[in-house]
Amino acid sequence: MKVKFKNSDLFKGNYKKFKLAALDIDGTLINSHHIITSRTKNAIKKAKDAGIKVTISTGRHYRSALSRAKEINIDAPLICSDGALIKDFSTNSAIYHSLSKEIAADIMKTASQYDDFKIQIFTEERKINIGSSYRSKYFKRFLREPLKHSPIGYFNLMRDFAFIPVTNVKNVDEAIKAMEEEPLKVVVYGNERQEDLKLFIEEITKKYKDEISITSAIDNCIDILRGGVSKAKGLAVVSEKLGLNREEIIAVGDNINDIKMIEYAGLGVAMGNAPERVKSKADYVTADNDSEGLAIFFEKLLAGEIQIKETLPQTKFCQSER
């Protein structure tokens, strides 16, 4: 059972109870320029020096997550693809929570019947795109958005994508042939009629019920995983491997796919840029990712200044580092 703390509770001098911190990447670890600031890196290092192991828990593909994991020198197993893959670098081993090829194939066929949906399949080593990478009008807009607000951010996002080997195929049948192993997840970008994605979700949920899990980290886009798989599931696997209980874990995130992880951890932290649905599940709300909220959280934690259900004031984007 998750421990909930009263508003008056402080962690003064008690940060040592926490042995692991699991960090989301997008909207949490990185800012809108897709940069991990020096302040954030320093705060993470100090947390590690204080005895808190640090890992990443992300919806990203393993290859994209790996570069960020190396950047902050994680010292616990890496959780990626929303908990569908856990990589332990200390033992060079992996744990998979894969979809069956049959279910993935049927989901892809169903999605392909909707106009202008973009479909991707994540396996451990690659990403498979059905149709042109830029076929979906919505997906084009999704890629253009970072360019509009931050050319540097767009460049860094594309650099992260470049780490992932990509196979482009024409249709679902070719995608099935291209899958050398069972898929970790199917990603579906909806079209400009958001009700179509809702209908698609209803259709596959009715058919597969508990055999699949559906989550989201991007507007009008869903990740379809094996039933029961989530970042929380991945975090439970990691905590068991490390011999930790839930009360010894910190989880920090900003989006819908972080909710279960935030609820699972002894100390669940929401970023200031998170929607209210996420903040309401957190024990603590820090500043937003463009105000170095993750760094601020660790600094306050180590200083014994964390008060549960405290919400830090949000500020405009920190221009000090790009």
Question: Model segments located where?
Answer:
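Conserved acidic, metal-coordinating active-site core of Asp-based
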Residues: 117, 122-250
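Residue-level signal for inorganic ion chemistry
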Residues: 47, 58, 82, 186, ...
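Conserved ATPase-coupling elements of RecA-like P-loop NTPase cores
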Residues: 32-36
